[in-house]
């Protein structure tokens, strides 16, 4: 249980497909705890193992009242044709934001800490965060999907209006 240092945005691990978890053991539990500690330290909404330099297909999403969503080897099984464009950012790319179009609804298969398959359906912001994390696990940063990267003035205007 340690706050880990984030890797720099140019680190090669952020641009490669991450290895699936194959062993559900104490090391995985420690990784999940490290991710949780780092997530809260960074005041982030989500974090993936490659963002702390770990080549394992694991991510966490803070769903606020519902708690933390653990994603282990997540795979999108289906997604809606209906999409929504919204602003995204990443703790890997501080102060950079872009508009990204993503499906409004998704169904994902993942695994729990014991290796049991779990299927979940997510909507709106949670679906967006899951897709963003799965992109991280596939070596895709949100800037590759963004149809518009905001300049400093646009970012200030956006956050002033929230």
Curated annotation (Swiss-Prot):
GO BP term, pick one: translation
Molecular function terms, GO-annotated: peptide deformylase activity
Domain of life: Bacteria
Annotated Gene3D superfamilies: Peptide deformylase
One matching Pfam family: Pep_deformylase
InterPro entries the record matches: Peptide_deformylase, Peptide_deformylase_sf
CDD domains given in the database record: Pep_deformylase
PANTHER family: PEPTIDE DEFORMYLASE (PTHR10458:SF22)
HAMAP family on file: Pep_deformylase
NCBIfam families reported in the protein's UniProt record: PRK14595.1
Similarity section: Belongs to the polypeptide deformylase family.
Protein name as catalogued: Peptide deformylase-like
High-level lineage: Bacteria, Bacillati, Bacillota, Bacilli, Bacillales
